[in-house]
Amino acid sequence: MRLIALSLACLLPLASLPATAADASVEARLTARGLKFSIDDDGDYKVVLNFSEEGRTQLVYVSGGTEDVSGLSIREVFAPAANIKTDGVTAAMALDLLRESRTKKIGAWEIAGDYLYYVIKLPDNVDAAQLNAAIRVAGSIADDKEIELSGDSDRL
């Protein structure tokens, strides 16, 4: 019984840590481009793009962690475009999104949980200007799709 209590006591502080830790290199690159951001509970960097001409905003996230793919460190930039359930994304639309992804030079549509995201996967060694460009591309494409699917709604 003491062993169980001791084990739980040792693990308890870990429960409050985010799933992925934020990365100081991302913070430095965002700051270098003058982008304001916050860090969410998962350790991802949340940027709100302002499309002033359209009077709209768009959420874009930069993952706080990376994934290793054959020795290449990959970081994701992702922007939500729709809620699958409330915005009525159908199976036929999903096939259209796959076809549309084929036409994009960088990034593709993905579904995670109940949301449709535009996701760009980059080598983590991109500089501040390149990361900023990816953020703007993902945000613009996602916002255009949000308008297409939900009309004037600007929830994401």
Residues covered by each model-derived region:
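Bacterial N-terminal signal peptides that target proteins for export
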Residues: M1-S7
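N-terminal signal peptide c-region/cleavage motif recognized by signal peptidases
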Residues: P13-P18
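N-terminal secretory signal peptides
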Residues: T20-S70
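Extracytoplasmic/secreted envelope proteins and their assembly/folding machinery
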Residues: D23, E27-L30, A91-L95, A128, ...
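A mature extracytoplasmic/lumenal domain signature
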Residues: D41-G43, F51, G64-T66, F78-A81, ...
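Short, internal acidic amphipathic alpha-helical interface segments
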Residues: S73-Y115
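C-terminal partner/receptor-binding element of secreted or periplasmic proteins
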Residues: Y118-L156
